[in-house]
């Protein structure tokens, strides 16, 4: 049987991996449980320069630039009174440093572009395909679907998000078969914060366009953070505050409109920018593209077992506060694709299919590489959300007097962020590509 990857999940990470496999000449199928991979999600995804570079490598840059929101400045402010504490041109500085801009993208637009550019979009994507079981065997995997179908392949890549069914099945297999105590089932993801992703009309609000506002510490005793970015017509926003009942590993409920209204009312007096409160924004909200949900956090120990491997939010999930969730997932996908391409290239020379042991070796290298890179980012996001929602004199003193003078984003035009994070971005090693550059050279380049 020709080597075939079964990708579970048709979100940005799953679709990106399909693009990578097409360029690696690896057969694949995407299983998506919804009736379409396209949706109307109003969630805004921050696409960092190193991730824009990944998209440029597969030919998507021009289309993405056409639909991206403009962004040039960042302003932090106190949620209680709207006083601006810091202003920076961080976004423009990063483009100077790396040659690529930050691209704020609606998730729906990104998915549409990934889908439309995929050669196998008609033949290699199965919708309404909910996975119920995965059975690895000596030479491949059997994936059972809720409709009774059986899909056969060589490996399964679980790109099915924070509530990954693939992970649940893998953990069950680990519990049944793993002899190594270190390979016990993963701990569950935990939600400590919840909030609203939404969109509102900016026609009457007059929020300054192309400025990313981050309002900190307002919203009652527990504190909250509100982030927003506007054009002259719309404003995209996200809010986060601690769950009233404390941390939970239960799946996020489907919040009702009444629950969203009550949540919004608790933030009504929080300044989202000078002169505009969250209550003003909520009065102009577009409910069709607005939703409330718990935001899980977790960093798992085990990313693979047998012929099953996990990627993206299925293994490392942060809140949205630092805007790095999708970036981490896509770069994990690039590393996994590189490992599979290298292994299969060697096996093709020998005219042999890779064994389970050889596949686990590739998965292990992928896990080791990405754990080293992602864990510091995850730790930073974990600390950041807890800091920005705080109320009290320590947080006030930090935001008012310390942050303006020792902000990593403004120090030397963001040089620390460029060197420690952005320049380290992954690349598909097997796809010829030169790309753009800036003042800070990329650590990884394609050598073909």
From Swiss-Prot:
It comes from the Eukaryota. It is an enzyme of class 1 (oxidoreductase). Highly reducing polyketide synthase; part of the gene cluster that mediates the biosynthesis of sordarial, a salicylic aldehyde structurally related to the phytotoxin pyriculol. The most interesting aspect of this pathway is formation of an aromatic product from the highly reducing polyketide synthase srdA. SrdA synthesizes a reduced polyketide chain from one molecule of acetyl-CoA and five molecules of malonyl-CoA. The polyketide chain is then reductively released as an aldehyde. This is FAD-dependent monooxygenase srdH. Belongs to the paxM FAD-dependent monooxygenase family. The gene is srdH. Its EC number is 1.-.-.-. Transmembrane segments: none annotated. Disruption phenotype: Leads to a delay in fruiting body maturation. One of its GO terms (molecular function) is monooxygenase activity. FAD binds at residues 32, 107, 313. The active site is at 227. It holds the Pfam family FAD_binding_3. One of its GO terms (biological process) is secondary metabolite biosynthetic process. Keywords: FAD, Flavoprotein, Monooxygenase, Oxidoreductase. Induction: Expression is up-regulated during sexual development. Expression is also up-regulated during confrontation with the arthropod fungivore Drosophila melanogaster. Its cofactor is FAD.
């Amino acid at each position: 049987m020709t080597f075939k990857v079964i990708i579970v999940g048709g979100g940005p990470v799953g679709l990106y991996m399909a693009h990578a496999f097409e360029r690696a000449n690896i057969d694949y199928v995407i299983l998506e449980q919804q009736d379409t991979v396209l949706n109307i999600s109003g969630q805004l995804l921050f696409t960092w320069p190193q991730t824009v570079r990944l998209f440029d490598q597969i030919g998507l840059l021009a289309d993405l630039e056409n639909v991206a929101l403009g962004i040039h400045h960042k302003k932090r402010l106190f949620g209680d009174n709207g006083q601006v504490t810091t202003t920076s041109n961080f976004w423009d500085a990063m483009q100077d440093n790396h040659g690529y801009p930050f691209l704020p993208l609606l998730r729906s637009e990104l998915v549409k572009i990934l889908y439309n550019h995929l050669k196998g979009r008609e033949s290699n994507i199965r919708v309404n395909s909910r996975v119920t079981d995965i059975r690895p065997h000596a030479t491949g995997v059997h994936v059972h679907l809720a409709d009774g179908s059986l899909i056969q392949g060589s490996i399964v890549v679980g790109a099915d998000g924070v509530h990954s069914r693939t992970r649940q099945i893998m953990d069950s297999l680990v519990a049944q078969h793993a002899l190594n105590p270190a390979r016990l089932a993963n701990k569950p993801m935990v939600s400590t914060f919840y909030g609203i992703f939404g969109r509102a009309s900016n026609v009457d609000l007059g929020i300054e366009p192309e400025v990313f506002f981050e309002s900190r510490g307002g919203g009652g005793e527990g504190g909250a953070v509100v982030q927003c970015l506007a054009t002259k017509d719309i404003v995209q926003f996200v809010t986060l505050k601690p769950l009233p009942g404390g941390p939970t590993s239960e799946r996020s409920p489907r919040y009702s409109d009444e629950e969203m209204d009550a949540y919004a009312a608790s933030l009504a007096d929080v300044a989202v920018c000078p002169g505009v409160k969250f209550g003003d924004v909520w009065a102009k909200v577009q409910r069709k593209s607005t939703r409330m949900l718990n935001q899980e956090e977790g960093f798992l120990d085990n990313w693979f077992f047998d012929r099953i491997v996990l990627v993206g939010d299925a293994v490392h999930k942060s809140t949205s506060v630092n805007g790095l969730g999708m970036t981490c997932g896509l770069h994990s996908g690039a590393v996994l694709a590189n490992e599979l391409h290298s292994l299969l290239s060697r096996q093709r020379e020998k005219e042999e299919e890779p064994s389970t042991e050889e596949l686990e070796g590739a998965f292990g290298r992928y896990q080791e590489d990405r754990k080293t890179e992602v864990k510091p980012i995850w730790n930073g996001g974990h600390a950041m959300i807890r800091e920005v929602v705080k109320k009290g004199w320590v947080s006030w003193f930090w935001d008012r007097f310390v942050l303006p003078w020792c902000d990593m984003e403004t120090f030397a035009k963001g040089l620390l962020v460029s060197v420690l994070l952005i320049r380290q971005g992954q690349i598909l090693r097997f796809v010829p590509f030169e790309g753009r550059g800036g003042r800070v050279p990329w650590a990884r380049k394609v050598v073909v």
